[in-house]
Amino acid sequence: MTRQRQAILPPDLSGHIPSLDGLRAFSVLLVLIGHVAATHGAPLWMDKPAITSLGNIGVRFFFLISGFLITTLLLREHARKGRIDLGQFYLRRAYRILPAAFAYIGLIWLAFQLGWIDLSLSVPTRAQDEAAPLRHLLHSLTFTANYNHDYNWYYNHLWSLSVEEQFYLLWPFVLVLAGFSRSLHVALAAILLCPLIRLAMHLWGDVPEIAFNREFQAIADALAMGCLAAMLHTRLSAMPRVKAFLTHPLAPLAVGGLLIGAAYASALVSRPFAFVLGQVLSNLGIVIILQHLVRSPGTWAGRIANLKPVALIGAMSYSLYLWQEPFLYFLVDSWETRFPLNLLLSFGAAWLSYRFIEQPFLRLKERLHGSPARSTAGVP
């Protein structure tokens, strides 16, 4: 794998990892609540910063899940084959992500060309820019939307998918070239450096506030925390007190929830603190909850996360994340964007995307390459 042939040790996870679909469902529901709260017809009590900012926490859950899952799959492949096939990895990612994403991007562009929607309106400035639609399209197609600060709503949410794609481009190469031990150090370095980068951006960078939650160098510690959790999974199991804490039916959920709550509260009170250290608290809380649920599917929380209806929402979470955006648009007051019909339309469009785009391409991947058709991406 490297010139020194450093061994990558697999985590003690095999087969389908329990609770991940449930975590995805929880994540995407946070996004839906955060977005629907500001739409026309929604109860007035929902249109508060404490509710509308829930979407950021939901996306951060997705990033932790992605780092954990992708690292687990790569380590598992190395344990099975003695190497990681980067070509096959990127082919699997392409089958999983690109069809639904490009279908959404293309249909939104078609709706714009037909005059049904407006891609020239900037959400941050509320200004019209006739040159903006093409810029938004190019950022979306090249997965650089996380650096498009003057965004339009319809392509806005693709910033998180852009972060995921940038992670996919970098992390597998780190594992292959550096090996397990050095990759562990890289993940730790990212966790330690990202808060300092956010601090430098706050003190000296002339950047909009949105950059702290979207630009890769500012948010990579969330992904790195998930990677680290996968690489240390077996070692944590060998620590009796740590394992007892993580498998306790209440303690990890309480501690994780308190950490996330502290980060959440800091974002409402002190934006600089939230940018620098609040995100660290949030990452720690999420990774504790993630470790609890994948280790303890038999606890009350684990059973909820693995219920069939919950797992179905989790399986549909990628399409649901893609298609909620045009219906949960707070600047448009139309029949399709009014609560609660906008939620029903979001789920309906997501089911169509999942049933007729995602699943056929996953089956095609299985038929051509022999990999399971089950969704394995951490993307929203």
How would you describe each model-predicted region?
Residues 15-18, 47-59, 126-135, 141, ...:
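Interfacial loop-to-helix transition and helix-capping segments at the boundaries
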Residues 16-76, 95-101, 135-138, 142-144, ...:
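Functionally critical transmembrane alpha-helices in membrane proteins and complexes, commonly lining
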Residues 56-59, 75-117, 127-133, 139, ...:
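Transmembrane alpha-helical segments and their boundary/interface "anchor" motifs
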Residues 56, 223, 227-228, 248-360:
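Alpha-helical transmembrane segments of multi-pass integral membrane proteins
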Residues 71-79, 111-114, 176-181, 228-238, ...:
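Structural signal for the C-terminal ends of transmembrane alpha-helices
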